[in-house]
């Protein structure tokens, strides 16, 4: 019996490492040994079971004596050697070795990164993750110790880095927005500077900002009249009674715009000179300009407006004398000619009805005279509006030429105050002449329209007085535009006198 027990233990010790190597053939041998042990045969089955382990290589026998850990490692090596170099076994072992090497590499790299981060934290003075976590817990009132233990040591530095990146991002946004605002401000200032240097754009911007000028009002009235008359069938006949169209036809609007430009330029020059002076020089110049403005007033207009003129020769003589006091090369011949033409037409229109009444013609001839009178009412009204527009346009043209000659003429032979007084008297004379001319036209209308109804005659008379009043206001506005021209002429003349 002892021999059998020894044989069984020997077989079991030999088969044990083979089962750990997951080999199928030794298991079969173990089963055969058990069956032989159970049988009552004495020694023949044992000899057959011992032959098979002897065929194993010497390396497998040596592993049986090693400890359990060494036997497991050696068993793994024998399996890798005994398995044929094909199938899933080969690829599985290769994948395991690859994963093990990759995990080792990752661990090494992670350890190196953690070392670098720790060095960066110490050099930059960044607190450790544990300190940051304790501060956060103290601030938020967290008391969980497990969360503190499980928190990764990399979260602290990355949290600091994320905070820094957020700050940089917000700073970048503010810098970009501030830069855009600065560019917008610079662009606006640049456009303002360009606009100041561009006379065309500057003039347009000035016209948009400032109140409407006289020329603009007249041009708008002209455009409205053109639109209104364009819808009428009898445009040629209606055009004769529109003041704005007639005023532009006689070049009055063009001369008024040119006079406004000269006045605006002179006003800018005067302001710049006043800004450059200071002290006693500034006060002295202001007092002299105030005296010039007082001499430039139209106070005499109300006093002399009631006086009546007797004939055209007096007007022509007076306007010529006043113009000679300005000492300019231009003469008021065109203005006097327009005025004389209007009075001659009035005389001829009033003479026809008187002659017809004196002759005492028959009833048929009286009917013809009624038709003539009816036509003469329309003609008188149309010619009255035309004469007022022509006389006003000639007056503004005279002021424009005077301003140009004063600015660009040679040395003055007369003082600026004397010129201002002469221009003031000239303006008063022109306004009075317009009033007298309108009265002459209304008298002519009343005489020619004796048999007409009041509804037909009164609107014509009212229109003549209205246009005469408008003409006088246009002349007064043009006269006021001459004040800056005389002021800059006075300043230039004052600076030239000491040099002479």
Curated annotation (Swiss-Prot):
Residues 1-82 are annotated as: Disordered. It holds the Pfam family DUF719. Keywords: Phosphoprotein. PANTHER family: FI01459P (PTHR12842), PROTEIN FAM114A2 (PTHR12842:SF3). Belongs to the FAM114 family. This is Protein FAM114A2. It comes from the Eukaryota. The modification Phosphoserine is found at residues 93, 152, 215.
């Amino acid at each position: 019996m002892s021999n059998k027990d020894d044989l069984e233990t020997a077989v079991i010790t030999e088969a044990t490492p083979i089962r750990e190597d997951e080999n199928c053939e030794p298991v079969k041998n173990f089963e055969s040994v058990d069956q032989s042990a159970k049988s009552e045969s004495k020694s023949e089955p044992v000899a057959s079971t011992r032959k098979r382990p002897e065929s194993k290589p010497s390396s497998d026998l040596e592993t049986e004596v090693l400890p359990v850990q060494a036997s497991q490692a050696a068993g793994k090596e024998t399996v890798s050697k005994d398995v044929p170099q094909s199938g899933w076994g080969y690829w599985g072992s290769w994948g395991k070795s690859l994963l093990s090497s990759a995990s080792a590499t990752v661990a090494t790299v992670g350890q190196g990164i953690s070392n670098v981060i720790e060095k960066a934290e110490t050099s930059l003075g960044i607190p450790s993750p544990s300190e940051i976590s304790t501060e956060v817990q103290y601030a938020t009132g967290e008391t969980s110790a497990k969360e503190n233990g499980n928190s990764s040591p990399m979260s602290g530095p990355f949290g600091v880095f994320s905070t820094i990146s957020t700050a940089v991002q917000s700073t970048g946004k503010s810098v970009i927005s501030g830069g855009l605002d600065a560019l917008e401000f610079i662009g606006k200032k640049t456009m303002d500077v360009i606009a100041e240097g561009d006379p065309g754009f500057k003039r347009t911007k000035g016209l948009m900002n400032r109140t409407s000028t006289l020329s603009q009002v007249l041009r708008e009235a002209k455009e409205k009249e053109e639109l209104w008359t364009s819808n009428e069938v009898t445009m040629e006949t209606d055009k004769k009674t529109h003041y704005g169209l007639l005023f532009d036809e006689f070049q009055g609007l063009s001369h008024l715009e040119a006079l406004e430009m000269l006045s605006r330029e002179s006003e800018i020059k005067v302001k710049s000179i006043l800004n450059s002076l200071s002290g006693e020089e500034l006060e002295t110049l202001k007092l002299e300009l105030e005296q010039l403005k007082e001499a430039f007033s139209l106070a005499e207009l109300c006093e002399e407006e009631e006086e009546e003129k007797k004939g055209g020769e007096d007007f022509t003589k007076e306007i010529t004398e006043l113009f000679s006091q300005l000492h300019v090369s231009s003469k008021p011949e065109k203005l006097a000619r327009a005025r004389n033409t209007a009075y001659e037409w009035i005389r001829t229109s009033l003479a026809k009805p008187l002659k017809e009444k004196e002759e005492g013609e028959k009833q048929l001839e009286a009917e013809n005279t009624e038709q003539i009178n009816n036509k003469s009412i329309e003609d008188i009204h149309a010619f009255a509006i035309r004469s007022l527009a022509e006389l006003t346009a000639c007056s503004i043209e005279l002021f424009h030429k005077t301003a140009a000659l004063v600015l660009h003429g040679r040395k003055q032979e007369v003082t600026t105050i004397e010129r201002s007084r002469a221009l003031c008297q000239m303006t008063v004379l022109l306004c009075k002449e317009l009033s007298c001319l309108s009265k002459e036209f209304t008298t002519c209308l009343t005489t020619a329209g004796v048999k007409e109804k009041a509804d037909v005659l009164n609107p014509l008379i009212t229109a003549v007085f209205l246009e005469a009043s408008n003409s006088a206001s246009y002349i007064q506005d043009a006269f006021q535009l001459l004040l800056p021209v005389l002021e800059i002429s006075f300043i230039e003349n004052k600076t030239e006198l000491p040099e002479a």
